[in-house]
Structure formats: structure tokens, C-alpha cells
A protein has these predicted regions:
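Flexible, glycine-rich loop/tail regions that form catalytic "lids" or insertion modules at the edges
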Residues: 1-249
């Protein structure tokens, strides 16, 4: 150690991070264009709600009637009604990213079905086959992964943070289950999500989806209210986004 008078720190913006630059103030002042053409949007809406057997366009998988109706209604939201609910807007956000070769990973305690039975990203056919429609929109698409995690916010968010660090070109999401319980992961949020770039010059693109706020559900069910996270904002370290319409997805 005495023979080495200086130490060099290698930039982390190498390897898989080589195409990423540091954020600037202007990045937080304007939104980039993220839309797709109406034609592509309609096409993806049909593909992402198609329940036919993979590799056999003429053979349709048999699902519970309510699931088939749900996916039929989702398709009609785009092709007929021209009005999307929250679940379909989220579905289309993922579909467009997948079509642009951006992998999407979603995990949480009830992420496959969705806490309010709204997502149904993983559906089960009558022969017990698991089917993820978003993985069948095209042959050259990116991968959609959705996992129902175990009951440990601290451990799961820590894992997803590490996954996002290794895969900066993917969208990695940790979803708090109903009631939030985000405070169970507070150490990861404080020490890594909010401050790793300042402390260790390490950026990370993990997204925390916290669908609830202060709704009178009790002390353990209101931990994701927005002011808790606003207090951790400094030097453009993160964005706090309050979605008020399905279009915000």
C-alpha cells in the first residue's frame, strides 16, 4: 500500500453503461417525445390482447370466460371506444417499449394479477398453461418479465436495484403492493435509490411504482405518500411522478 501513492477510480460509465450520460437540469424541465404512430398503437393493442396459441394462429387457448371477456374489452378500448382504462394504458406502455427492443421487468407481491385484479399480465389456461400475452406481440420483440415476489420489501427492492444496475437499458420496476409498505424498504430507498450517485458515483434507473398515498388505511398502509419521497429529492437525483390519468403511463 505504501508503494502505491495514488489510486485511480474507473468510471462506471463503461460497458453496458457506455451509452448513458449524466443527467442535466434541462432533462428535468422538458419531456421527450415518446409517442408512437396510431397505426402501430392499434396493431400492438391487437397483438397484446390476442389469446391464440403461440405458433398456431388458428388455435385459441381456452381461458376462464371472464378473462377472455376482459381481453376482448381491452382490444375494443382501442379499436372501438377510443378510451383506455389504467390497466390497458399500462399494457400499451409496456407493449410499445417491447416493440422497441427495451426489456421490461416488473416484480411485486401481487404483480402478475395486480392488486385490484386489474392487470392480469399472467393468465392461466384451462389446461393449466401459464400465458403472458405481452411476450407474444412479435418474433423480434424484447422480453417482458413479471414476478410475484415474496413478502419482503427490503430484500426484493434491493435485488431489483441490483438488477437495474446491471441492465441500464431495461425498464426495471418494483411495485409496492396494496397498502404500500414502502417503509419496509426504506433503507434501500435512503441509502441507494436516493443517494448512490452522490455517494458512489453510481447511477441506477430502477422505478418504484407506489400506487397509493394517504388514504386512511392505517399507519402501515400509507407509507408511500408523496411528501416522504419529495424530502429525498436534491440535485436532480430522481423524478417523482404523480399519474393522474391513464395517458400518463
Amino acid at each position: 500500500a505504501k508503494q502505491q501513492e495514488t489510486a485511480s477510480v474507473t468510471s462506471f460509465l463503461e460497458g453496458v453503461w457506455s451509452g448513458v450520460r449524466r443527467s442535466e437540469s434541462k432533462d428535468f424541465e422538458e419531456s421527450p417525445q415518446t409517442g408512437v404512430s396510431i397505426k402501430k398503437f392499434i396493431d400492438l393493442s391487437k397483438r397484446s390482447t390476442d389469446l391464440h396459441k403461440p405458433g398456431s394462429p388458428g388455435e385459441k387457448l381456452k381461458f376462464f370466460a371472464k378473462i377472455e371477456k376482459l381481453y376482448e374489452n381491452r382490444r375494443k378500448m382501442v379499436t372501438e371506444n377510443k378510451s383506455l382504462d389504467w390497466a390497458m394504458a399500462e399494457n400499451m406502455a409496456y407493449a410499445t417499449l417491447l416493440s422497441q427492443n427495451c426489456n421490461v421487468r416488473l416484480s411485486g407481491q401481487d404483480s402478475g394479477r395486480g392488486t385490484f385484479s386489474q392487470r392480469h399480465a399472467i393468465i392461466t389456461a384451462e389446461d393449466n398453461t401459464k400465458y403472458v400475452p405481452l411476450n407474444h406481440i412479435s418474433e423480434d420483440q424484447a422480453t417482458f418479465e413479471v414476478y410475484n415476489s415474496f413478502l419482503s420489501e427490503y430484500g426484493v427492492l434491493g435485488f431489483e436495484y441490483g438488477y437495474a444496475y446491471a441492465s441500464p437499458n431495461s425498464l426495471t420496476i418494483w411495485e409496492a403492493q396494496f397498502g404500500d409498505f414502502a417503509n419496509g424498504a426504506q433503507i434501500v430507498i435512503d441509502q441507494f435509490v436516493a443517494s448512490s450517485e452522490t455517494k458512489w458515483q453510481r447511477m441506477n434507473g430502477v422505478v418504484l411504482m407506489l400506487p397509493h398515498g394517504h388514504e386512511g388505511q392505517g399507519p402501515e398502509h400509507t407509507s408511500a405518500r408523496i411528501e416522504r419521497f419529495l424530502t429525498l429529492c436534491a440535485d436532480n437525483n430522481k423524478q417523482i411522478i404523480n399519474c393522474t390519468t391513464p395517458a400518463n403511463f
